[in-house]
Regions:
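Short acidic/His-enriched helical or mixed secondary-structure segments at domain edges of catalytic enzymes
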Residues: 525-527, 601-604
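Intrinsically disordered, low-complexity charged/polar segments
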Residues: 474-479, 594-602
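Periplasmic/cell-envelope proteins involved in peptidoglycan metabolism and beta-lactam response
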Residues: 1-277, 302, 382-392, 435, ...
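Beta-lactam-recognizing serine transpeptidase/beta-lactamase-like catalytic domain environment
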Residues: 61, 202-207, 211-215, 255-307, ...
Length: 650
């Protein structure tokens, strides 16, 4: 049996081997290409990245030529190192280090030796390139910013690292890739497809012809142009209004979910992350953790929402049927909700939903929140019902927008409080601060903007997004999917009536814009930090949300100014100016505009530069840079995230 089996196995193996050799040699030419690799030079043709335009067709980001010196280590011969280093203004130590790095990548494949030469450096090297065997010029395209704003929206491009090369076979050493912003989100559209040329070499390593007449060559495909939803003029104006302030602005077109402005402050000129100084500038921005210019507050900062959250408290109470628009409560400058527990309020008298919202009465909203929770036999059930309503507004979750960064905020559930109070019971009184947007609730500015957009739409929203058009491409269908909240449409009208009178009778009565019906809500959130073991009061935050016009709204906006005192001090005026700018295309309230543009919170931020607070920042794992870089005139200070109680009522 063994005598028969062994020859049979050998025969079958031989047949398989012959078939494989036939396939590789006759059918599959790729092996021949690989075997000839020692006599073939590979050259890449890099396409231009797609241009970036705003919603109105204004060019924001174009391209400029860049030149890299590439090296193939095995081809470097008879090099005059002194002359070479002198020409490129590098030291011999730098030369040795760069060559060693190239050899590690591959002795036979090209990699970047020196990147992003300017035109003068390129011309000088090109004249004598023939003297330096193994080196050649690779042309690429770098970004050429047409504007000085929008850095957080655009992101930047940088060289790929080893991990990217390992995980994605498209990229080779020296290739560029988008990081942050739309450059990262839409990398595959913007980058295009690089072309490849295979060049036959002779025994003297000289180029002689295209390999096999160019049979394996591919043509570069240019990147796709894109239009953003951003209104360039509104974005620019928002950044100007936030100079010398810290915070975020997010403006959305309610009926589509298109992001009209996404402002973070402080910011920087995107042009500083282009060219030979890009790495140095990025490092300085990255380590500037006082100003944190790379931190997009509109998407990443999780704040206590303060009084604007009362909008949701009211809508959920209406939906749960625990109140109607005429349900009333008496306020005595506050609310005694438990023994020894008193929630302050600036209001007094009888409040129903309408004046409760425009006067921002803490007493009113604390009562209706407790009624919502107490509707159910167990507070845990009540909290989960309340929480599920809020999830339908996009709270407590990543919203699915098309930017590569973000936070989901914090939305407490019964599990939250079972964990917080494991040894004793809790009820609606224990967690009543949720009623006014404090307690355990945290929201990002984009969530606040989406919340007020939902109110403007009377109960629905489209996922906020930054892309409007891709040339030759299709917008993701998730941005065309309508999301409906759990709150019935009929409950939004009485709430909107109260928000409209915030501008007519309430906390924003001095911020009206002639000819525009605005609905909005002020917010003031107290701010505390623990310093040397003590709870210390810091300056309050200023918050404002609004939409306009009241009917057929065109813009919904959220503004958050850190340490901005109260809602109507900074966030309110900035909101009304942004609305006027977008709808009217001009500003009529010149004095107010001047005050906001020239106003600065630098003196306030300087108070928090004392050593105890700096030590607090260090303990919260924030590394401080001794040399912060800021291109625009922003103050550089940050504070640890602290949950706050809102006692002002506005």
């Amino acid at each position: 049996m063994r005598k028969v089996l062994l020859p049979t196995i050998i025969f079958i193996a031989a047949i398989l081997l012959v078939m494989r050799l036939f396939y590789l040699q006759i059918i599959d030419d790729s092996l021949k290409l690989k075997s000839d690799n020692n006599a073939i030079k590979i050259r890449y043709d890099y396409p231009e990245r797609g241009y970036v335009y705003d919603r109105n067709g204004k060019l924001l980001v174009a391209n400029q030529p860049s030149y890299d010196i590439m090296v193939i280590p095995k081809d470097v011969k008879d090099l005059d190192t002194t002359e070479f280093c002198s020409l490129l203004k590098i030291t011999k130590q730098e030369f040795i280090k760069k060559i060693a790095k190239a050899k590690i990548y591959s002795p036979r494949l090209p990699s970047v030796f020196l990147s992003q030469l300017n035109k003068k450096e390129y011309a000088a090297f090109q004249e004598v390139q023939r003297m330096f065997l193994g080196f050649y010029i690779q042309k690429r395209a770098l970004r050429d910013y047409q504007v000085t704003y929008g850095a957080n929206v655009f992101g930047f491009i940088t060289q790929v690292n080893d991990k990217i090369i390992e995980n994605n076979p498209y990229y080779k050493s020296g290739d560029l890739i988008g990081k942050q912003g739309i450059e990262e989100s839409y990398e595959e559209f913007l980058r295009g497809i690089k072309g490849v040329k295979y060049i036959q070499k002779d025994k003297y390593n000289r180029d002689i012809a295209s390999y096999k007449g160019g049979e394996f060559d591919t043509i570069a495909v240019q990147g796709k142009d894109i239009n953003l939803t951003i209104d360039a003029e509104l974005q620019k104006y928002g950044e100007e209004l936030m100079i010398n302030k810290r915070g975020g602005i997010v403006a959305i077109e309610p009926r589509t979910g298109e992001i009209l402005a996404l402002v973070t402050a402080p910011s920087y000129d995107p042009a500083i992350l282009v060219g030979r100084q890009r790495s140095k500038n990025y490092t300085m921005l990255y380590h500037d953790s006082i100003a944190k210019p790379l931190y997009d507050r509109g998407l990443l900062a999780e704040y206590t929402p303060g009084s604007p959250f009362k909008i949701l408290t009211g809508l959920v109470a209406l939906q749960e049927g625990v109140i109607d628009e005429n349900t009333s409560f008496v306020c005595h400058h506050g609310f005694s909700y438990a023994r020894g527990r008193f929630m302050k309020c600036h209001d007094s008298g009888v409040s129903i939903l309408h004046n409760g919202i425009y006067n921002s009465c803490n007493t009113y909203f604390a009562n209706i929140y407790m009624k919502t929770i107490n509707k159910y036999q167990q507070p845990s059930t009540g909290v989960d019902v309340w929480s599920n309503h809020l999830k339908s507004f996009g709270l407590g979750q990543f919203m699915g927008y098309d930017l590569p960064t973000g936070k989901k905020g914090s939305l407490p559930t019964s599990k939250t409080y079972k964990k917080m109070y494991p040894g004793w019971g809790w009820d609606s009184k224990t967690i009543v601060s949720n009623a006014i947007g404090q307690g355990e609730v945290l929201m990002t500015p984009i969530q606040l903007a989406n919340m007020i957009a939902i109110v403007a739409n009377r109960g629905y929203y489209y996922t906020p997004h930054i892309i409007k058009k891709i040339k030759g491409g299709v917008i993701d269908k998730r941005f065309r999917t309508k999301h409906v909240t759990t709150v019935n449409k009929k409950h939004f009208e009485p709430m909107i009536s109260g928000l409209f009178d915030v501008y007519n009778l309430g906390t924003a009565h001095g911020l009206n814009v002639e000819g525009i019906e605005i609905c909005g809500k002020t917010g003031t959130a107290e701010n505390f930090a623990k310093i040397n073991g003590k709870r210390v009061k810091l300056q309050d935050h200023s918050i404002f949300v609004a939409f306009a016009p009241k009917d057929n709204p065109k813009i919904a906006i959220a503004v958050f100014v850190e340490n901005g005192y109260w809602g109507a001090r900074w966030a309110g005026p900035i909101t009304s100016l942004m609305i006027e700018k977008y709808i009217k295309k001009k500003i009529t309230r010149i004095d107010l505009e001047k005050r906001m543009l020239e106003g600065s919170l630098q003196a306030e931020y300087n108070k928090y530069l004392s050593k105890p607070i700096i030590d607090t920042l260090i303990k919260t794992k924030i590394e401080l840079s001794s040399k912060p870089l800021s291109v625009k005139p922003e103050i550089k200070v940050t504070q640890p995230q602290i949950k706050a109680k809102d006692t002002s009522g506005n």
